[in-house]
From Swiss-Prot:
Compartment(s): Nucleus; Chromosome; Cytoplasm
InterPro entries in alphabetical order: G-protein_beta_WD-40_rep, Swd2/WDR82, WD40/YVTN_repeat-like_dom_sf, WD40_repeat_dom_sf, WD40_rpt
Biological source species: Mus musculus
Gene designation: Wdr82
Annotated WD repeat ranges: 19-58, 105-144, 146-184, 192-231, 236-276, 280-313
Alphabetical list of Pfam families matching this protein: WD40
Family: Belongs to the WD repeat SWD2 family.
An MF annotation (GO) of this entry: chromatin binding
Effect of inactivating the gene: Embryonic lethality after embryo transplantation.
Protein name: WD repeat-containing protein 82
Length: 313
């Protein structure tokens, strides 16, 4: 089944899970699309089975809190940041609920975490105005970049370069093998800073970069030229909430939730809004991602919703 405007318009909530007592701050699908794992401000980690459509288990990180949870490439392991007493990144085995390793170094809260799509490397960005490069096999930081402001960062789909959005005004591209030489490209955005950048993602084909903000617009940028291709708006976000924007796996569509529980979908090429879907969420949709392998997506406030299309194209 191919994603089209009409298939996207047909998506409806198939299941809602109420496992959390506070907002879900992040979730991540496993690379095979079979599970999704969430982190919440209630200090819990919930693992869901996407095929059965049910929660499998719940773990807790009461002391440190849990945010920015990401699957690694090894089965049943995740990395996540703390949102309580320290700024160390933790590497957890879900199998026996034990920490494999800690990654200390940041002196302020970690606000971005991206796992390499190809190996055990990951990057983290912090309010201490640095991006750190790590390897899961070592607790020592493998590289450090000092920036002029708060960073958002992500690997490209090949795992060869990473992009850093700095100070909500420029995107810098680094070659992973020679990042210490500085960025090989810098794109300055000529825009009035009415809001902060809260996320940065590459499309799966590597051609586009999506910048999410805590305002009521997101930007789609050409990853090679740094040109803004589209600015998408017209969704509700009056309280400057961090709303996650995402690409569909075919790189063709862009989705974002809103504070009123609706999901807005645009065609990336034409820039036209193709759908507004009502998730009937009780709060702002802080997390939204399409499953990498199956025709389903998930959205979350303090509840988690799984969506399915209602037509067969």
């Amino acid at each position: 089944m191919k994603l089209t405007d009409s298939v996207l318009r047909s998506f409806r909530v198939a299941k809602v899970f109420r496992e959390n007592s506070d907002k879900i701050n992040c979730f991540d699908f496993s690379p095979n699309g079979e599970t999704v794992i969430s982190s919440s401000d209630d200090d819990s980690i919930v693992l869901y089975d996407c095929q059965e459509g049910k929660p499998k288990r719940t773990l807790y990180s009461k002391k440190y809190g849990v945010d920015l949870i990401r699957y690694t490439h090894a089965a049943n392991t995740v990395v996540y940041s703390s949102n309580k007493i320290d700024d160390t990144i933790r590497y957890l085995s879900l199998h026996d609920n034990k920490y494999i390793r800690y990654f200390p170094g940041h002196s302020k809260r970690v606000v971005a975490l991206s796992m390499s799509p190809v190996d055990d490397t990951f990057i983290s960005g912090s309010l201490d105005k640095t991006i750190r490069l790590w390897d899961l096999r070592s607790p020592n930081c493998q590289g450090l970049m000092h920036l002029q402001g708060k960073p958002v960062c992500s690997f490209d789909p090949e795992g060869l370069i990473f992009a850093a959005g700095v100070n909500s005004e420029m995107v810098k591209l680094y070659d992973l093998r020679s990042f210490d030489k500085g960025p090989f490209a810098t794109f300055k955005m000529q825009y009035d800073r009415t809001c902060e950048w809260t996320g940065l993602k590459f499309s799966n084909d590597g051609k586009l970069i999506l910048i999410s903000t805590n305002g009521s617009f997101i930007r789609l940028i050409d990853a090679f030229k740094g040109v803004v291709m589209h600015t998408f708006g017209g969704y509700a976000n009056s309280k400057a909430v961090t709303l996650e924007a995402s690409f569909t796996p075919d790189s063709q569509f862009i989705m974002i939730g809103s504070e009123d529980g609706k999901i807005h979908v645009w065609n990336g090429e034409s820039g036209i809004k193709v759908a507004v879907l009502d998730g009937k969420h009780t709060g702002p949709i802080t997390c939204l991602q399409f499953n990498p392998k199956f025709m389903t997506f998930a959205s979350a406030c303090s509840n988690m919703a799984f969506w399915l299309p209602t037509i067969d194209d």
